[in-house]
Amino acid sequence: MARLAELYNKEMVPALMKDQNYKNIMEVPKLVKIVVNMGLGEAIQNVKILDSAAEELAAITGQRPVITKAKKSIAGFKLRQGMPIGCAVTLRREKMYEFLDRLVSVSLPRVRDFKGISGKAFDGKGNYSLGVKEQLIFPEIDYDKVDKIKGLNITIVTTAKTDAEGKALLKLMGLPFRN
């Protein structure tokens, strides 16, 4: 069992029940999934960029990504429906907890001028989205093999009903919020 999953079951659930006044253990919010997405507009001109991005995403998450395609054509961007424009990975269970643990303890501290993550990026339902400007903060990425710096989005989906519940859960998980 992942270290963070064990910590959640043994320490975080009782702490959240006491803190939020839950009567039933099933009311306690938990992580559902983590979606890591890399959108690549440059893939319209050069499809090889997509291959390197997929390899990097697979190295970061430990799971093979799905190539995302354009939903509709946009003439201004020279984009046709069905063209590959990015890649995404959905992590659940053990891999989800392991990824979040690595993100909090190893990757986020490697961000330049890091003062914590914003507490305002919740969606109103307790889910949190985080943007990473460069993939080099992950130790799995070899700096010499990177041809272009790419950003990625990380969405953490929880069962929390409100942003306050979601923030309390993620704070206990170790996410360093600024305010």
Curated annotation (Swiss-Prot):
One of its GO terms (molecular function) is rRNA binding. GO terms for biological process: translation. Keywords: Ribonucleoprotein, Ribosomal protein, RNA-binding, rRNA-binding, tRNA-binding. The keyword Lipoprotein does not apply. PROSITE patterns: RIBOSOMAL_L5. One of its GO terms (cellular component) is ribosome. Gene3D superfamilies: 3.30.1440.10. The keyword Ribosomal protein applies. This is one of the proteins that bind and probably mediate the attachment of the 5S RNA into the large ribosomal subunit, where it forms part of the central protuberance. In the 70S ribosome it contacts protein S13 of the 30S subunit (bridge B1b), connecting the 2 subunits; this bridge is implicated in subunit movement. Contacts the P site tRNA; the 5S rRNA and some of its associated proteins might help stabilize positioning of ribosome-bound tRNAs. Part of the 50S ribosomal subunit; part of the 5S rRNA/L5/L18/L25 subcomplex. Contacts the 5S rRNA and the P site tRNA. Forms a bridge to the 30S subunit in the 70S ribosome. Belongs to the universal ribosomal protein uL5 family. This is Large ribosomal subunit protein uL5. The lineage of its organism: Bacteria, Pseudomonadati, Thermodesulfobacteriota, Desulfuromonadia, Geobacterales. The gene is rplE.
